[in-house]
Amino acid sequence: MPFGQYDPLGQVYQCFWKNDIHAVVLLVPDAECWVYAGQDLRARYQRDGLTVVHLPMKDYRGAGYPKLRAAVDETLRLAREGNNIVMHCHAGLGRTGLFAACLAIRQLGLSGDDAIEWIRDLVPGSVESDEQEKVIREFALEDSGT
C-alpha cells in the first residue's frame, strides 16, 4: 500500500508514474487506507487521473462471487484496452494473492487449487487464510459456468 507502513514515503506511488500505470485495483476498504496510509487513497488515485477498480475486502477475508466477478471483468477489460494496472491490498499477500489467483483462473484456465499454487510459487505467502482459499475455489467453480 503506497504511503503505508511498508512504504511510508510513497515510493511505490512514484513507481506508478515511472511504469505508466493507468489503473489501480484497490482491495481494501477506504477506512483501512486511512488507518495505514493516512489518506483516502481511492480519492487520491481518482484525483490523479487513475481508473480505480474498488473491491473492498477485510483483511484475511474475501468477497462474494458477483462482486469478485465484476472486478475481474473490469480489470481484464482495462487490460485489453492497453492499460497498465497495479493491484494492492495492505501487504500484498492475502487479498492481492486472492485477486491474482482469480485472474489466473479466468485467463489461464486454472482450477482453484492450481491458481493458489501458481500465485504462491510466484509470491510465497500469498493467500493467507482458509477463507481466502475457499473464495478462490468457489470462484473457479462459479466462473467455469460463464
Question: Where in this protein do the model-derived segments appear?
Answer:
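Conserved G/P- and acidic residue-centered "switch" motifs that form tight phosphate/ATP-binding loops
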Residues: G92
